[in-house]
């Protein structure tokens, strides 16, 4: 099972992908697990972020959707949240900017009433065959977007989070099985898993749980926007299940970690990889 070869400009637009990723728009059914909660999701416009936003809304949460510049994708996701009967706020901007991270949290507090769930999901990657191809600016952008942003978001959010709140970092199978072509990205994803494990210990006394999710190859706009077309065509074929995952297949894990169903789950890294081991 594969996708046609295709290429987009960074950051990628979901509506222009073939096939369009399945984020659970027509399939996810909630059962009230997050009623009364406020969630902040970075990279919430498309892919995994959209699937999580839809699932959270159908479980009863209001959602702030942070995104870089993909206005049409973000508005589509907002529409799905609002059709679930929940409030939604869009925040356009770059999480590589520490002040923007602080503004995201303050906006959630001001417009939605607080922060109960923080999902640090926005990510940047590029594929290279040699270290010499990676510019200093690209290295810095990857670090700032993927791991520094999580630090700034958490630092701003924690004072507003009550006992029972949840922080979730989107790590990757690359945290354990790093792709040599994605060296900067893989390093940041390992850092996210490690940072979440540290935070779980720091915040346990406050009753705040912290976990990370390690997706395998998931069909999102990041793929055609950052990989050469020939790699896109065969993306996901090397998993034991023989295919890339769909964003909707991640959403139930985020719901578990955000809800009382996961009330004793903290410090974990949950692998959703199609069979590729994360030990």
Give the location of each predicted region.
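A conserved structural motif in NAD(P)-dependent oxidoreductases
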Residues: 239-250
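Short C-terminal tail/terminal secondary-structure segment
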Residues: 17, 22-26, 128, 177, ...
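Active-site helix of classical SDR
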Residues: 154, 188, 196
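Short, small/polar-rich loop/turn modules that mediate ligand/substrate recognition or access, typified
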Residues: 204, 209, 265-267
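Residue(s) in the substrate-gating loop at a strand-loop-helix junction
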Residues: 172
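Substrate-binding pocket helix/loop in short-chain dehydrogenase/reductase
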Residues: 129-131, 135-140, 235
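The beta1-alpha1 cofactor-binding region of Rossmann-like NAD(H)/NADP(H)-dependent oxidoreductases
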Residues: 71, 92-105, 136, 248-249
């Amino acid at each position: 099972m594969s996708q046609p070869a295709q290429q987009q400009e960074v950051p990628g637009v979901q509506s222009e992908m073939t096939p369009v990723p399945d984020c659970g728009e027509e399939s996810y059914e909630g059962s009230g697990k997050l009623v009364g909660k406020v969630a902040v999701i970075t990279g919430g416009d498309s892919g995994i972020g959209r699937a999580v936003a839809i699932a959270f809304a159908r479980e009863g949460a209001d959602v702030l959707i942070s995104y870089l510049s993909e206005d049409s994708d973000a508005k589509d996701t907002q529409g799905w949240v609002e059709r679930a009967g929940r409030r939604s706020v869009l925040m356009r901007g770059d999480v590589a900017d520490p002040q923007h991270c602080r503004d995201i949290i303050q906006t959630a507090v001001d417009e939605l009433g607080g922060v109960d769930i923080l999902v640090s999901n926005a990510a940047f990657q590029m594929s290279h065959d040699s270290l010499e191809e990676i510019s200093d600016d690209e290295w810095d952008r990857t670090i700032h977007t993927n791991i520094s942003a999580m630090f700034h978001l958490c630092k701003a959010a924690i004072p507003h989070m009550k006992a029972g709140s949840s922080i979730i970092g989107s790590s990757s199978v690359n945290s354990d099985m790093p792709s040599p072509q994605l060296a900067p990205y893989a390093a940041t994803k390992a850092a996210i898993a490690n940072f979440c494990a540290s935070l779980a210990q720091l915040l346990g006394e406050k009753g705040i749980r912290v976990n990370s999710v390690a997706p395998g190859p998931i069909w999102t706009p990041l793929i055609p926007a950052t990989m050469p077309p020939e790699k896109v065509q065969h993306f996901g074929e090397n998993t034991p299940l023989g295919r890339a995952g769909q964003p909707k297949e991640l959403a139930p894990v985020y719901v578990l970690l955000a809800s009382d169903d996961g009330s004793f789950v903290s410090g974990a890294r949950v692998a959703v990889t199609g069979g590729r081991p994360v030990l």
